[in-house]
């Protein structure tokens, strides 16, 4: 735990103005890549969808994946399927959820992307996540979860599929919210409040999907870590 880590410069030489923003595993079976997509999200709320197959061959010096404005940068890259939803979260506590299948697929790598979320003053995107889509409205799902005498089979199905969005703030506060509370909308909207960014809480540091039985490890910018159960 006390190790300072190893440099990745031997794997990917970076220029002085560049930094690593995302690391993701790929399916070992490359025949699956044609069915998958890569989602890019930027600090200023832009989003882009490419076929994973577009990046099947990358030279050792890397490949330009997306054009960016001078004041923008990539904050996250993630693999998704057509039947999944995308969630963008901002540092001032806003979240927006929309369908992956409604994003057009970009063929080249020269585009700056399209608007994923409309940001308020001084707000920036800090997290990109993927969730499995559900075929039930949030209102019906929440009603079934609250009503113990409801259709037991349907209620059990909803509980089994339920995930949570865990939002953590810079001052160490967290909030766990059912993903049924995040209704699916069109991309480019203002989103809803996922967690309040107040003087007590601070701005949002991270927001990501979890299961109730998961454990998470939280790390500070000084290298301290803590491990705790999501249900706590």
Predicted segments with their positions:
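Short, structured "edge-of-domain" segments at secondary-structure transitions
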Residues: 1-232
